[in-house]
């Protein structure tokens, strides 16, 4: 089973972000709702009203079903958007914080609690778009094994998926989203734990970590946030879904690229992986954030080799996209390579190209 969640920004013809997710959801659902079914996908709200979520109405059995259904969902969503455009990436390259609007309908008390604790008027809240992947587990043993394997893979997954090199019209890190994400809850560091989770030996141990977060939130009067989703590490356990949720990836330029990341992760999780100390993982995550795949290529090539060895026939078909990203650079790296001069005009031109990639399901080269 495969459970993807995609986040895309809503834009006008000049790629100014437009905060109208509530209007789109009202058009689809008949009233202002948190989410609404559109064909075989579900369209949902996010904290920021210029971002909209796409997820399947039910988990997928195969990668081909994933690609076909979610691309169909993108096209159906575009058909009800009155000419507005969708854009992937981990951050909107032109968004100004003063122009961002926060969801002000149902669930707003959750966002109000976050704002009271952390001041959400920052890029780490209002300008991040991720591709999240839910990996199911059938037993506690499998959940613990998957959690610990994904923990070791997080820096490498982040490197291949890094796709947020521009913020407010200027170049930053290759994965600028990750930089802001890591500090957006610094007042309660237990929540994010520098993205790398602790190695666990049981789900009881995981629940103990989660309860520690809850205790700190209760001390601050934020009872409404004491839910399993508040944990912001790069992988978390979703007991309500019986799955692990990977949160470290930037949204990509098209559905095919998201499917390729999924194929890579599913295959490599079948391999034996070497345990690494937390300080080494943080160092590698810092490298992924700053320069994408550039300084991690030997390890990434070895992981790609292992993933191919453990991949099924369908997964292997998508490995060429991952190979391209490892050898030629992540989406964020490619963007910087193709933009020797960063100007508003060049960024708009880039956004036009990336928006077409999403519409046509084409990988950006």
Curated annotation (Swiss-Prot):
Family annotation (SUPFAM superfamilies): Glutamine synthetase/guanido kinase
Molecular function per GO: glutamate-cysteine ligase activity
Pfam families linked: GCS2
Family matches, as InterPro entries: GCL_type2/YbdK_subfam, GCS2, Gln_synth/guanido_kin_cat_dom
Annotated GO biological process: modified amino acid biosynthetic process
Gene3D superfamilies, A to Z: 3.30.590.20
PANTHER family linked to this entry: GLUTAMATE--CYSTEINE LIGASE 2-RELATED (PTHR36510:SF1)
Protein name, UniProt field: Uncharacterized protein AF_2307
Species this chain originates from: Archaeoglobus fulgidus (strain ATCC 49558 / DSM 4304 / JCM 9628 / NBRC 100126 / VC-16)
């Amino acid at each position: 089973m495969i459970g993807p969640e995609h986040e895309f920004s809503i834009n006008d013809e000049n790629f100014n972000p437009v905060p109208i997710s509530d209007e789109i959801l009202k058009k689809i659902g008949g009233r202002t709702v948190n989410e609404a079914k559109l064909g075989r996908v579900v369209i949902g709200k996010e904290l920021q009203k210029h971002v909209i979520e796409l997820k399947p109405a039910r988990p997928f059995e195969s990668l081909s079903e994933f690609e076909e259904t979610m691309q169909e969902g993108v096209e159906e969503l575009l058909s009800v958007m009155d000419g507005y455009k969708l854009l992937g990436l981990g951050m909107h390259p032109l968004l100004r914080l003063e122009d961002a609007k926060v969801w002000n309908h149902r669930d707003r008390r959750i966002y109000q609690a976050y704002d009271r604790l952390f001041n959400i008027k920052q890029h780490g809240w209002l300008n991040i778009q991720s591709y999240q992947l839910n990996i199911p587990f059938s037993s506690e043993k499998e959940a613990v094994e998957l959690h610990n394997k994904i923990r070791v893979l997080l820096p490498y997954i982040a490197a291949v998926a890094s796709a947020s090199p521009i913020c407010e019209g200027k170049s930053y890190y290759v994965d600028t989203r990750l930089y802001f994400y890591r500090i957006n809850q610094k007042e309660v560091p237990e929540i994010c734990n520098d993205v790398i989770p602790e190695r666990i030996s049981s789900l009881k141990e995981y629940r103990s970590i989660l309860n520690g977060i809850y205790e700190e939130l209760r001390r601050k009067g934020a009872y409404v946030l004491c839910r399993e989703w508040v944990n912001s590490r790069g992988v978390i356990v979703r007991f309500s879904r019986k799955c692990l949720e990977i949160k470290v990836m930037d949204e990509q330029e098209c559905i095919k690229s998201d499917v390729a990341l999924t194929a890579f992760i599913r295959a490599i999780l079948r391999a034996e992986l070497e345990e690494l100390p937390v300080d080494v993982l943080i160092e590698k995550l810092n490298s992924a954030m700053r320069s994408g795949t550039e300084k991690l290529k030997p390890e990434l090539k070895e992981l790609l080799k292992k993933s191919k060895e453990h991949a099924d026939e369908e997964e292997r078909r998508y490995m060429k996209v991952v190979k391209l990203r490892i050898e030629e650079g992540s989406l964020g790296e490619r963007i910087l390579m193709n933009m020797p001069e960063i100007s508003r005009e060049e960024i708009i031109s880039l956004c036009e190209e990336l928006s077409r990639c999403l519409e046509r399901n084409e990988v950006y080269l």
